[in-house]
UniProtKB/Swiss-Prot annotation:
Disulfide bonds join 37-53, 44-58, 52-68, 60-66. It comes from the Eukaryota. It comes from Agelena orientalis. Insecticidal neurotoxin that modulates the insect Nav channel (DmNaV1/tipE (para/tipE)) in a unique manner, with both the activation and inactivation processes being affected. The voltage dependence of activation is shifted toward more hyperpolarized potentials (analogous to site 4 toxins) and a non-inactivating persistent sodium current is induced (site 3-like action). Interestingly, both effects take place in a voltage-dependent manner, producing a bell-shaped curve between -80 and 0 mV. In vivo, induces an irreversible spastic paralysis when injected into insects. The lineage of its organism: Eukaryota, Metazoa, Ecdysozoa, Arthropoda, Chelicerata. The modification Asparagine amide is found at residue 72. This is U3-agatoxin-Ao1f.
């Protein structure tokens, strides 16, 4: 009985690690697909690109002209 429980626990842990690794790889692939980014005051579109570079976020105060704005370290 202990052997069965141990085997189930080990299987669960192995599955959890495999799932975490595949999620991380998927996120890396998604980030790679985003392509080049645009800087401050450049036109952007979070849903389809172009995307803002790291340190900026896309704001749509005057839709459809969305621009990248500095996130000020948020």
């Amino acid at each position: 009985m202990r052997a069965i429980i141990s085997l189930l626990l080990i299987s669960t842990m192995v599955f959890g690690v495999i799932e975490a690794v595949s999620l991380e790889e998927g996120l890396k692939i998604f980030e790679g697909e985003r392509g080049d980014c645009v800087g401050e005051s450049q036109q952007c579109a979070d849903w389809s690109g172009p995307y803002c570079c790291k340190g900026y976020y896309c704001t749509c105060r005057y839709f459809p002209k969305c621009i990248c704005v500095n996130d000020n370290g948020k």
